[in-house]
Each structure stands twice: as structure tokens, then as C-alpha cells.
Amino acid sequence: MTTVLAIETSCDETAVAIVNNRQVCSSIIASQIPVHQQYGGVVPEVASRAHLETINDAIAQAMDQAQLGWDKIDGIAATCAPGLVGALLVGLTAAKTLAILHNKPFLGVHHLEGHIYATYLSEPTLDPPFLSLLVSGGHTSLIYVKECGRYESLGETRDDAAGEAFDKVARLLKLGYPGGPVIDKLAQTGNSQAFALPEGKVSLAGGGYHPYDGSFSGLKTAVLRLVQQLERDGDPLPIEDISASFQATVAKALTKRAIACALDYGLDTIAVGGGVAANSGLRQHLQAAATANNLRVLFPPLKFCTDNAAMIACAAADHLSRGHLSPITLGVESRLSLSQVMKLYQ
């Protein structure tokens, strides 16, 4: 069994966790949402400073919660890509320092691989191959998971990620940041069929549409025009109905592409990861469609949908058990394809 302490600081969560054999021993998350709410979104420099202020306490809390000594830790890991460079550097530097101080193996982990591994925290016996639907504020992708470190992108958004679309529509409706949870809550009492909105198909040069790629910029623009028209007419904004219609449109678009992709590639399991995996509309639509097509769909526990270090530790432990180690000179990258994961290891 492999026990790994991991650090996640790719954006606005300072997270530290210890995982043993895909079982979470401790998980600490210091959210920066209150800090960034006044700006309506994440400010990179503010995020980096907040990470610096909380990282040491988070590490100490994770060790205390796990009730483990450093002699029981087999490896130290940190998210190294993709993400905000300054934020990533805080976590990576802390992990390297701990690895050197305690003479432990060091591993850098791809943030999106972590979201794939979040499913293993509740489904430890899951075996590849399977389809991963990654839906977050920065990424929306369909990934063919072949084995640890081997991934193939089958579809993605051509512009705004799903989570980014939620935040932008929430800002348009003056709902605050982050937008996803607020829209989800309002949608519960709204009419999802009140407004017809575009699902964002991507045209192919030879005609027809890409079966797995999508676009959310047109949907965002459609909501903007809807709001402008209602305001011109002097009508009160039916926020609940707009939220429900928008959320249902996103859920349908993601569900159609995920189901089609799984069936076309003969994959019987769809594992969903990322912050939007917590969305109730997506969960309901995808579960119903999967059941109708004799497919299995897996969602992480809600606490592991958003950024956390447990998923990073889980991925790192799998790499460590295979003898994959990162050089202590490893740097951070703001962008890195999942297909390049193995470049992080020697």
C-alpha cells in the first residue's frame, strides 16, 4: 500500500490531503472564494498570496487529521500543471521542500488527471478503459482513459468551458461568484422549458457537426440577448426560469456528447469529474441517459468534485506504485495536454 501527501494550489483552493490505497486519511481545503467574490472572479496575484499565507497550516492540519508521522508517508506530490503559474509555484515549492527535508520521492501531478482519479476515491476497484467527462471552470473534455498516464482526448469545448459559462451567465444575471452553485439552486424552482437556447454544435468543414466537440459561447450570447430583450420590453427578469433553461441546455449538450462518445468507442462506463460534476441538472440528465443506454455513470462525492488534494494524492500514488518519479527540478506549466502527462516523470 502506498501513502502519499499531496498539495493542490492550481487556482483558488489551498488543499492538502493524505491518501492511502485510495482511502482518504485526511483532506484539508482552505477556500479563497470569500477573498475573490469582491472581484467577481479569481485574481491570480491575490490567489498566490493567499496560498502562501495558508499552505503551512494546511499541511500541519492534514498531518494531524491523518494521525500519521512522516515515517509513514511514502511520497510527496503537488499539482504542477495546468493552472495559474504563481499559484502552482506555491504548492510545488512546498512539496519539493518537504520531499527534500524528509527524504521522500517527489511527484508532480497533472491537475486534470487528478479530476479523473477523483472517481477512484469512491470507486477504488474501477478499472480502465472508461470515458472521463471532465467539466470544470477551465476545461470541458471527453477523455478516453486507457491506463495510468495514458489518455486520449476525443472531444472538447472550442471556447468557454462549462464552468466558465456558468460564471459568465451568473455575472450577467448579477448573481455573484461562483456562479454554478447559485444557478443550480435557482434552477430548482424554475421552468427549464421556459426559453429555447442553443446547445452549441460545432460545424465541420465538409458539412454536419462534430459528434463530441461543443461550444458554449453562443449559449452565453443567447442568454445575453434574452436578458436585453426582456429589459427592453420592461419585463421583470424571470431569474429562476432563465437559470433552469440555461442549466438544462448545458446538461443536455454534455449528456448527448458523452453518451454518443461512450457508445461509439464501446466504453460501458462514464466517470465525471470537475466542479460542474456537482451540478444537479447534469447529474440527473446524464444518469437518466446512461440508464436508458445500459451504461454506467459515476460521479465523485460532492466534496471531491471541486479542486482538492485527495484526488492529486490518489493519482500520485498510482504513478509512484509504477515507479514513476519526477525530477526535483520539475517546473510548473500554465498549459499542458493530458496526452503529455508522462513527460512529468523520469
UniProtKB/Swiss-Prot annotation:
Protein purpose: Required for the formation of a threonylcarbamoyl group on adenosine at position 37 (t(6)A37) in tRNAs that read codons beginning with adenine. Is involved in the transfer of the threonylcarbamoyl moiety of threonylcarbamoyl-AMP (TC-AMP) to the N6 group of A37, together with TsaE and TsaB. TsaD likely plays a direct catalytic role in this reaction.
Protein name: tRNA N6-adenosine threonylcarbamoyltransferase
First and last residue of the signal peptide: none
Positions contributing to substrate binding: 134-138, 167, 180, 184, 279
GO CC entries: cytoplasm
InterPro entries recorded: ATPase_NBD, Gcp-like_dom, KAE1/TsaD, Peptidase_M22_CS, TsaD
Record family assignment: Belongs to the KAE1 / TsaD family.
Encoding gene (name): tsaD
Cofactor note as given: Binds 1 Fe(2+) ion per subunit.
EC number: 2.3.1.234
NCBIfam families recorded: gcp_kae1, T6A_TsaD_YgjD
Record Pfam families: TsaD
GO MF annotations in UniProt: iron ion binding; N(6)-L-threonylcarbamoyladenine synthase activity
Catalytic activity: L-threonylcarbamoyladenylate + adenosine(37) in tRNA = N(6)-L-threonylcarbamoyladenosine(37) in tRNA + AMP + H(+)
Cofactor(s) recorded in Swiss-Prot or TrEMBL: Fe(2+)
SUPFAM superfamilies linked: Actin-like ATPase domain
Lineage: Bacteria, Bacillati, Cyanobacteriota, Cyanophyceae, Nostocales
